[in-house]
Amino acid sequence: MPRGLELLIAQTILQGFDAQYGRFLEVTSGAQQRFEQADWHAVQQAMKNRIHLYDHHVGLVVEQLRCITNGQSTDAEFLLRVKEHYTRLLPDYPRFEIAESFFNSVYCRLFDHRSLTPERLFIFSSQPERRFRTIPRPLAKDFYPEHGWEALLMRVLSDLPLRLPWQNKSRDINYIIRHLTETLGPENLSESHLQVANELFYRNKAAWLVGKLITPSGTLPFLLPIHQTDDGELFIDTCLTTTAEASIVFGFARSYFMVYAPLPAALVEWLREILPGKTTAELYMAIGCQKHAKTESYREYLVYLQGCNEQFIEAPGIRGMVMLVFTLPGFDRVFKVIKDRFAPQKEMSAAHVRACYQLVKEHDRVGRMADTQEFENFVLEKRHISPALMELLLQEAAEKITDLGEQIVIRHLYIERRMVPLNIWLEQVEGQQLRDAIEEYGNAIRQLAAANIFPGDMLFKNFGVTRHGRVVFYDYDEICYMTEVNFRDIPPPRYPEDELASEPWYSVSPGDVFPEEFRHWLCADPRIGPLFEEMHADLFRTDYWRALQNRIREGHVEDVYAYRRRQRFSVLYGEMLF
């Protein structure tokens, strides 16, 4: 390979990343217009388009590099020099951290995810830690209550770029002050002030004002979800001021925010104070930089692995028929490998399973489906694998494993946030906790269905409970669109013997679902059945599901709230907003 090409290749990769992130910002910048026009279908399409941008631009760069090198193979020394030149381009580059991830992606595409070593890739960042901690320009504006909180909030809302009229701005300001007074007390509130992000965070049908409530005793989140009425008038639906509430809003089971972030590292650093429980990977994920979030997630895994003496074990819960799931006992992720062969009742292919996971990645997850990171040729040290798990891997997924002596390589896997399986949770709780879990499960089903997602397999074992007590779906192999399902009533038996027969007396076609049957497995436990009948009996009715289908087919997009209904101002303070 001719010398001098290394710099050209490094520059080509960085220019390719520039093009990708420019398009990323372009799609993101359209969020305000989509919100103001209430074009919710365009919101959903923009979310999918933005996710696809990264892989598309990686592919373009790979083709450019093949042209530059005339398709010639490259030796290890040449690749090391390319990385060296690329590293020299980064000190003055504002999005250096994501540019490193883009380099990794191009390398993996060129070499089929092989030879993934720290010498060839940016396994850890090449840049000093201070670059992540320095915010080069203000990302937020401070507001002080010199003339009281009513005047302060009027300035905050008047500063917003939204061009729609307010339904009743004074009412909303009074609601916020009332909430803050109840939360902090009048004296603390008078000594507090706000710091508000310059950019709004758009997601679904809301524009979120994200800020920090700086009080004498510490800094709290300050989150205002701004919605619009059917008449196109703005209103604030609630005010959230706890880290737990903020964590749910920025949760791993939600779609990525559209927030204009030319300096993503700076925004992540600014958010860290109000989201102390979130990892760096989760913060990048929340603002839509999902590929760099994957890099950070892998780094978090490596750091944990270096500091622990644990071995991977099979994850707790009922063993899956499609996925083999394992974990490190102290690490909050699970690793999911598609089995070589599925249980007989699972009539599907591995390609179908991967397509289902991609559907979830691109769809609105409404806070009820866990996000995943997909890895290829994932290397594990054998010393980190328990003998029982190694035996299970070779038994269930041998075709996806390459033995390298002291290591194994798993050809393909997913990494996902670990939760307590709902079936285990229900065995361990009682009283109000049990009631809350059943309410959450039913709400998860409803919200998924309203977002045009039918889980397929609704057994409790396919759902998990987060640290905030939310129920989240995580088994995607039978997932499909609501509009693809044929919901049917079970026909009455022709003869008394029909009900005793081992086979149904009626025909069943692919896609047929009988909601009456849900009762058999969801209400079998006498502790759970009465609660389910009380709160979610309509899930057993065909007309409920068909009505949802009709709304979806008519183009209706449901509101999605990242907080409880009882937290809405209309419920707290009594006035219906629309």
UniProtKB/Swiss-Prot annotation:
The active site is at residue 371. Bifunctional enzyme which can phosphorylate or dephosphorylate isocitrate dehydrogenase (IDH) on a specific serine residue. This is a regulatory mechanism which enables bacteria to bypass the Krebs cycle via the glyoxylate shunt in response to the source of carbon. When bacteria are grown on glucose, IDH is fully active and unphosphorylated, but when grown on acetate or ethanol, the activity of IDH declines drastically concomitant with its phosphorylation. This is Isocitrate dehydrogenase kinase/phosphatase. Its EC number is 2.7.11.5, 3.1.3.-. It is found in: Cytoplasm. GO terms for molecular function: [isocitrate dehydrogenase (NADP+)] kinase activity; AMP binding; ATP binding; phosphoprotein phosphatase activity; protein serine/threonine kinase activity. Belongs to the AceK family. GO terms for cellular component: cytoplasm. It catalyses: L-seryl-[isocitrate dehydrogenase] + ATP = O-phospho-L-seryl-[isocitrate dehydrogenase] + ADP + H(+).
